[in-house]
Amino acid sequence: MAKLFGTDGVRGVANTELTAELAFRLGRAGAHVLTRQGHSKKIIIGRDTRISGDMLEAALVAGICSVGVDVYKIGVLPTPGIAYLTRKLGAGAGVVISASHNPVQDNGIKFFGPSGYKLPDELESQIEKLALDDQAELPRPTGGELGRLYYVEDAVDQYVDFAKATISTDLKGLKIVVDCANGAAYAVAPRILSELGAEVIPIFHRPDGVNINAHCGSTHPETLMEEVVKQGADLGLAHDGDADRVLAVDHLGNLVDGDQIMVLCAKHLKSKGKLRKNTTVVTVMSNLGLYKALERSGIEVVETKVGDRYVLEKLLETGARFGGEQSGHIIFLQHNTTGDGIITALQLLAVVKETGMSLAQLAGQMERYPQILKNVQVKDKNYVMNSPIISEAIRRFERDLAGQGRILVRPSGTEPLVRIMVEGKDMAELQSIVDKMAEIVGNI
């Protein structure tokens, strides 16, 4: 792992790339960097349900305590819950052990600053440099100066109460199927919905350490789509492993993606005078239908790179408070400092309740243009992306689309993949283009 930090912290195969030794080093370096500027000398740690979380958590705790910083352990909790508690508990930093939607063999370590925001690149670089430097002179306190380990017994309760308070309506009369991805949402998502009055049918809510994201959750919503229809539910919700995203399913079993959720939430916020700057921040992956739907409603759309950290940066830069990604990472900055699948689900459900419309009716406000995505595994994604062959191929195929579509080729921020997206009106033409682009990328 030549460069540790990617777009969403440090990721790798647990115990080969992301080892206990590396976690220990990251704990030492992170605690030193994030608490030396007068910030609180306590760090909170939370994780998802992966089997490797125990090992990495123990190593991080040891590293943090070894530089004289206290650890407050909160156990399994959604990533946005850790961001929230970092702020609420007055910690100098928060640490999340999770690889989000990735398979079980992967894990990750991500830091939040004292305000609950992901770290800027320069702080991550400082932590990385110290973690990799065998000669780094970090503190080695002794005796009573060592850090201690504490347990936050009511962490789940605190996050549940916080999330519930973000909407002013109950959910009585709604029958909801919720897919917890056998991940961090398993204890909180069904409970929150139930306490707000919904009839809740949880699925994939029994984590065993190895079944996280396994044919379930927001990256595999097929079972949820079937279950919503089978149960006669009003809608379904699908979280990923760390519950920082959500997708929905209407009563007919149709998937409602992040773009559609953003359109209906943005329009509802605007109708209540609560859409700050009359702006929604989206990424280059958002569907053309989103742009058209928001433009029809007189809402300004600001575009940024893929990744919720870039959505957040653009929100802070523009003063807007709402934005997100097609994948279901959606930020309501008036509520939390990062993408929050639980809070997004609650805002969506509040729109359903307050408008009296079904999710199918609401989602129909956006016409989704056909979009085909394809991932190509590569050895060196940067080499591929810098090849002039790619830019020439994009120009050639976009000429064929004649202004009625677009092609986007980008590297994954967390995996050795190049992602291809082709969008337009003719599915056969799109499939032909994406297959040809994938072949070109694979041969570079």
From Swiss-Prot:
**Pfam families given for it?**
PGM_PMM_I, PGM_PMM_II, PGM_PMM_III, PGM_PMM_IV
Q: List this protein's GO terms for biological process.
A: carbohydrate metabolic process; peptidoglycan biosynthetic process; UDP-N-acetylglucosamine biosynthetic process
The entry's cellular-component GO terms read:
cytosol
Identify the domain of life: Bacteria
Catalysed reaction per UniProt? alpha-D-glucosamine 1-phosphate = D-glucosamine 6-phosphate
Relay the cofactor remark from the entry.
Binds 1 Mg(2+) ion per subunit.
Determine if Magnesium is one of this entry's keywords.
yes
Asked if the Swiss-Prot or TrEMBL record annotates the protein with the keyword Magnesium, the reply is yes
State its Enzyme Commission number(s). Answer: 5.4.2.10
Location of the active site: S100
Which residues does this entry mark as bearing Phosphoserine? S100
Q: What class of enzyme is it?
A: isomerase
Its post-translational modification remark reads: Activated by phosphorylation.
Q: Name one GO molecular function term.
A: magnesium ion binding
List the cysteine pairs that form cystine.
none
Q: Per UniProt, where does Mg(2+) bind?
A: S100, D240, D242, D244
* Matching PROSITE patterns: PGM_PMM (PS00710)
**Which cofactors, if any, are listed as required?**
Mg(2+)
What's in the keyword line of the UniProt record? Isomerase, Magnesium, Metal-binding, Phosphoprotein
The record's section on HAMAP family has: GlmM_B
The record's function comment reads: Catalyzes the conversion of glucosamine-6-phosphate to glucosamine-1-phosphate.
What family classification does the UniProt entry report for this protein?
A: Belongs to the phosphohexose mutase family.
User: How is this protein named in the record?
Assistant: Phosphoglucosamine mutase
Q: Which organism is it from?
A: Desulforamulus reducens (strain ATCC BAA-1160 / DSM 100696 / MI-1) (Desulfotomaculum reducens)
